[in-house]
Amino acid sequence: MAMDSSLQARLFPGLAIKIQRSNGLIHSANVRTVNLEKSCVSVEWAEGGATKGKEIDFDDVAAINPELLQLLPLHPKDNLPLQENVTIQKQKRRSVNSKIPAPKESLRSRSTRMSTVSELRITAQENDMEVELPAAANSRKQFSVPPAPTRPSCPAVAEIPLRMVSEEMEEQVHSIRGSSSANPVNSVRRKSCLVKEVEKMKNKREEKKAQNSEMRMKRAQEYDSSFPNWEFARMIKEFRATLECHPLTMTDPIEEHRICVCVRKRPLNKQELAKKEIDVISIPSKCLLLVHEPKLKVDLTKYLENQAFCFDFAFDETASNEVVYRFTARPLVQTIFEGGKATCFAYGQTGSGKTHTMGGDLSGKAQNASKGIYAMASRDVFLLKNQPCYRKLGLEVYVTFFEIYNGKLFDLLNKKAKLRVLEDGKQQVQVVGLQEHLVNSADDVIKMIDMGSACRTSGQTFANSNSSRSHACFQIILRAKGRMHGKFSLVDLAGNERGADTSSADRQTRMEGAEINKSLLALKECIRALGQNKAHTPFRESKLTQVLRDSFIGENSRTCMIATISPGISSCEYTLNTLRYADRVKELSPHSGPSGEQLIQMETEEMEACSNGALIPGNLSKEEEELSSQMSSFNEAMTQIRELEEKAMEELKEIIQQGPDWLELSEMTEQPDYDLETFVNKAESALAQQAKHFSALRDVIKALRLAMQLEEQASRQISSKKRPQ
């Protein structure tokens, strides 16, 4: 502080001093202002035609401009040491012309020691350092003598300690000067206030980084970092800790709905556990489901997007088939005894548990049908049938079991015989050739289920090596004196994936996917029409809705949809598609109702998802318009293929039906006295008929070949457009 106060007296505006730039360059600058509070000066200089300036601490000024300190007077001492008195006397003697001889060597050494001590003080002030000189202090004690005149007769008494002090002081001065000259600025230079603030901020950032790193280390110890998504697992666990869970129980009341939409979550299977997948589905209450969708920000920061869905019932992974049946299909059994039509669907991704829910527990390819909704509904049907109020009706129980594959019907209880769907004059849909089997107990029903399930068509997809690629419909029909009293249709729908998700994307697979998605779209529209009491129900859009037409019309019709979902993180996209489909069927949402524009957008998204990726023309880009036109061509080709296939089958049947005529002609020739004229006439007539059918069959086959080529071309174009660049 003494140095600062002394230096302040030397600093004033306009003074030229030396400064050091941040790049190490030292040049001259003029003092502009002197700030006593901050102990700094503001300087300015001209550079490149412009005036620049900066602030410099007093210590930096002293370090770069030591000459300012050298000009300062020394502080007066009350008791001057011996060497200072000698120096003063020496100067006085030199100031007058005296004939006294020159001083001896002892006085010269004293003079040298005095200059050394003075330089040491100045150097210490220049460097703003406290220099401890224990040797000097001791030497002072050694040579402190009473102020008596020094006699030449005893020079050795003071000469020895003075020489020792002189040598020690010179060594300390040289060491201090050496260190100061080696690093004249950095050793004593203090930083400006701005630099100090920046360093404080930097230190805080480093401390925060260290704390975050320590927290990450602790979290990494709590979670197995070998998991590919352990960070998402931690975030999901922390989010679930904030939830209050009230799951569905068997004691909860059963609410009756005309359209009941439920969702069921299955547990992680062995394959998902082997891949160390995490569960991204939470069910905190009996009607609420949360999807923790993993996301990445632009800077690759991981976060969760929690999406909520509301349904009539939500079943977690601990719910058994009995619990699911109690709240879904069981209330519908009463409906068919009251003369109504009931339908229960299982909808979802391949491998999400549809067949397990409807058909029973699976062990490999073997299935325990007694644990499925099929068998449970059958048991309740026979229980109600034997009650006194319904026993007097004389009801009989029949069952049918068929599948819809690629738009064609096959009877699973009659060796997969092909069926035809026709509409009679009363606009009633009839399934020609479908056999109804009379059953007398639930055990008979289970046998029928086992027999039909063994014949069901399956295929391989990315999610399931034995995936059901057809819609299976098990119907329980009540008849009173041959007349239908009620019907309960239990449908296990095919997987809702697109054809591009299968292992082998050949034409057959594409046709499967297109037909499945088309029927699912038609089914959703029919259910929504039923819920909104619309006058028109679009049941003719697919074979599935045609067969179930009577379930969508009439006031005494009830429907239940069970949406099954997979909880793994790899199935998150398909799970969201399933939940959105089910949510739009019921039109239940935790948010406010959508506006008209949002409904149009929703319909457009549904058409895209359910038409094997078709795009609806509208506000689309050029590439999207091209893809939309190609998708439209693909759908037209698929529809044309199905129509031509039906025509080809009809022409072939007509040709086969002419077979007996040729056999009759052959038998005629076996007779010894057959009429040749009659033979020729019949042969010409048969040839004319056959030529007509063969010509028609040839035209149909040509058109079918062309349609297949168009479908192949459209499929390749769509694949090339969808392939990432």
Curated annotation (Swiss-Prot):
It comes from the Eukaryota. Residues 89-116 are annotated as: Disordered. GO terms for cellular component: centrosome; chromosome, centromeric region; cytoplasm; cytosol; glutamatergic synapse; kinesin complex; kinetochore; membrane. GO terms for biological process: attachment of mitotic spindle microtubules to kinetochore; cell division; establishment or maintenance of microtubule cytoskeleton polarity; metaphase chromosome alignment; microtubule depolymerization; microtubule-based movement; mitotic metaphase chromosome alignment; postsynaptic cytoskeleton organization. ATP binds at residues 264, 348-355. Residues 2-254 are annotated as: Globular. A motif (Nuclear localization signal) lies at residues 415-418. Pfam families: KIF2A-like_1st (PF22923), Kinesin (PF00225). Keywords: Acetylation, ATP-binding, Cell cycle, Cell division, Centromere, Chromosome, Chromosome partition, Coiled coil, Cytoplasm, Cytoskeleton, Kinetochore, Microtubule, Mitosis, Nucleotide-binding, Nucleus, Phosphoprotein, Ubl conjugation. Residues 207-238 are annotated as: Negative regulator of microtubule-binding. The modification Phosphoserine is found at residues 6, 22, 95, 106, 109, 111, 115, 166, 175, 187, 192, 519, 621, 633. One of its GO terms (molecular function) is ATP hydrolysis activity. Phosphorylation by AURKB, regulates association with centromeres and kinetochores and the microtubule depolymerization activity. Ubiquitinated. SUPFAM superfamilies: P-loop containing nucleoside triphosphate hydrolases. A motif (Microtubule tip localization signal) lies at residues 98-101. Changing residue 109 to E: Alters interaction with MAPRE1 and association with microtubule growing ends. Interacts with CENPH. Interacts with MTUS2/TIP150; the interaction is direct. Interacts with MAPRE1; the interaction is direct, regulated by phosphorylation and is probably required for targeting to growing microtubule plus ends. Interacts with KIF18B at microtubule tips; this interaction increases the affinity of both partners for microtubule plus ends and is required for robust microtubule depolymerization. Phosphorylation by AURKA or AURKB strongly reduces KIF18B-binding. PANTHER family: KINESIN-LIKE PROTEIN KIF2C, KINESIN-RELATED PROTEIN 6. This is Kinesin-like protein KIF2C. It comes from Homo sapiens.
